[in-house]
Amino acid sequence: MDYKNLVAERIKENTELEVDLIEKLIEIPPKKEMGDYAFPCFQLAKTFRKAPNLIAEELKEKINKEGFEKVVTVGPYLNFFVDKTILIKDVLEKVLSEKEKYGSSKVGEGKNVVVEYSSPNIAKPFHIGHLFTTAIGNALYKILSFEGYNCIGINHLGDWGTQFGKLISAYRRWVDEEALEKDAIGELLRIYVKFHEEAEKDPELEKEARLNFKNLEDGSKEETELWNRFKDLSLKEFNKVYDMLGIKFDSLAGESFYSDKMDAVVQEIDDKGLLVDSNGAKVVMLDEYNMPPCMIKKSDGATIYATRDLAAAIYRKKTYDFHKCIYVVGTPQALHFKQVFTTLKLMGHDWADDCKHVGFGLVKLANKKLSTRNGDVVFLEDLLNQSVEETLKIINEKNPNLKNKEDVAKKLGIGAVVFTYLKNNRERDIVFDWKEILSFDGETGPYVEYSYARGKSILRKAGELTGEADYSKLSSKEEFELAKLLGGFNDAIMNAIDKLEPAMVTRYIIEVAKAFNKFYNAHGILNAEDNDVKLARVKLVEATCQVIKNALNLLGIDVVEEM
């Protein structure tokens, strides 16, 4: 039984409000003793022409209370106390019958959602900042897919621009082929940095680089072969990280893919009378929207990011007919996307309202103990490997005889890092601290994983239990609170979709783990007072493990069965 929906249906029977609106208005009371659901009656004041607290009293008398222990008023709120036995039975039976599908729905059926995420720059380090977009995008992809949406994950590679002209010049002069084979990104970064150092002394290098890129744009064989080599070497390195994270994309159409589509976009903007000359550059004026102009072409005739993003959005709409197009890109790019979406609207593309920028914060290091290959850039692959190594050390201290400990360390170590990136509001900065990230206490990935492994250990020890569970035996506060939380999984997912915020699922599963450990510490499970209580509690453990596993899967994190 969906109690939130039941509350909404009962209110609808006595008001003119629609169920969808009522469900949005329903709140969870701040204190458990105030009930399980609360409906604020302010919305009804105009219709009923009474004060909200009087409306609450009137509804309390009229409402059908079947399925609820009681319905009470608290000022202008109508508070519902659910029938605990019915709720526990309904939730656990639903979880245990639906298993890995529990929490899913078909709400997005028939709707395409484009998710652009990760998008590293070719020939540049795949650094720790990139995990923010990669983890958020992957989680949103999985969450939306779980609710029936058809998702298209796009890795919009930074594989075009004048920097490739510079890299070609640098390659021809200074590349060490042996170093390139050993550490492609490191060597490409080294020669790119050297180009900038040398260009300060010799400005002719910049001219040469521009000519190289012009040749690349014109399809010159030599420049194109070098560009393809840079791209192949980079993707080989990037794929090591994607394999560690278990991430695959539906499309790798990056900036270069749109290079032959931009002239048509510029022409369309011009045809609409939007293109204005500004000191030799071509721009779209956005003064009336309190934004600076959106630059379409630089004074030298080169296109920039905005032009490519306009071309990409138009191509994606034509190709995928998306319901939503989500851009998981850092918060500093917020103005850029506002300019792009506004320009699309001015071009007559009303679907621009379906384009959403999902911003995120910065990654900071609590100390400088993370080794770096080049300067201050921390490579993501190194970070993940270090997390696995640190986790293996902890396992060797705590449980040296654990089977498959290397595999467990890999899942736990990588999962702990991903969990950290998804734990809080995405626009908050992350301060990276190994001690906190890998702790088995507190709001961490290992804490949630340990809760799951603890539950699985109980289930292995319990073995096959026969008979039908009597859920009325689960009468304690801890058992009810845990079951009630399990029943809220889909709500957490829908909140994550509504806010495009995976942390709604992460925070939810932390609360589930806390509630499970409270229950575990308060009650005997395998040594319960009788077999009926034991069976019911084992079923509660089984349902909890299923929900934790489902939630972590949505976040792109593997569970460990034992630790």
From Swiss-Prot:
PROSITE patterns: AA_TRNA_LIGASE_I. Pfam families: Arg_tRNA_synt_N, DALR_1, tRNA-synt_1d. Its EC number is 6.1.1.19. GO terms for cellular component: cytoplasm. It comes from the Bacteria. A motif ('HIGH' region) lies at residues 120-130. InterPro entries: aa-tRNA-synth_I_CS, Arg-tRNA-ligase, Arg-tRNA-synth_N, Arg-tRNA-synth_N_sf, ArgRS_core, DALR_anticod-bd, Rossmann-like_a/b/a_fold, tRNAsynth_Ia_anticodon-bd. One of its GO terms (biological process) is arginyl-tRNA aminoacylation. The keyword Cytoplasm applies. Keywords: Aminoacyl-tRNA synthetase, ATP-binding, Cytoplasm, Ligase, Nucleotide-binding, Protein biosynthesis. Disulfide bonds: none annotated. GO terms for molecular function: arginine-tRNA ligase activity; ATP binding. The keyword ATP-binding applies. It catalyses: tRNA(Arg) + L-arginine + ATP = L-arginyl-tRNA(Arg) + AMP + diphosphate. NCBIfam families: argS. Monomer. This is Arginine--tRNA ligase. The lineage of its organism: Bacteria, Bacillati, Bacillota, Clostridia, Eubacteriales.
